Amino acid sequence: EPDSYVAGIGRMCQRLYAYADARRNPGEAIVALGHLHATGAELSDDDRSERAIMGGLESVSADTFDAGIAYTALGHIHKAQRIGGREAVRYAGSPLPMSFSEKNYRHQVIAVAVEEGKVAGTEAIEIPRVADLMRIPDSPLPPEEVLRCLAGLPEPEVVSEDESRWPYVE
């Protein structure tokens, strides 16, 4: 549909690429940024902030981003991943867990090296977690069992005065 959201995003990306391409100097790279749902992106099972809108009707294909773009950095999906099998179209993922559904994710940023207008390499840089995410218990239990689980937690060796480093407990 010519008036759909996806078609509009496609037209906008084409125009922006043509504008940037016409003005760049030899050897300069074009880097695109987008905060959107891409077709084929893996979503968290139980995180509502990443839900596919209208069953994925507003998902944008990796082909929307011209092959002349050196790197397309996407945001909104919290799990690091490549899109459409293209190394240069990726979600870096969130640098910090945004919900308990991300407790087992590897959180990172992506460093992108560009030479002569092309990606020369990428490096995932893991972000250390400053506060643990603890789900106690891992599955529903009666209140007395939950209290038993909490009582069984080991005492921390050092209690930080900095509350931002205290664990998040669910």
Regions found by a protein language model. Name each.
Residues 1-170:
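Extended recognition/assembly regions associated with phosphoester-bond processing machinery
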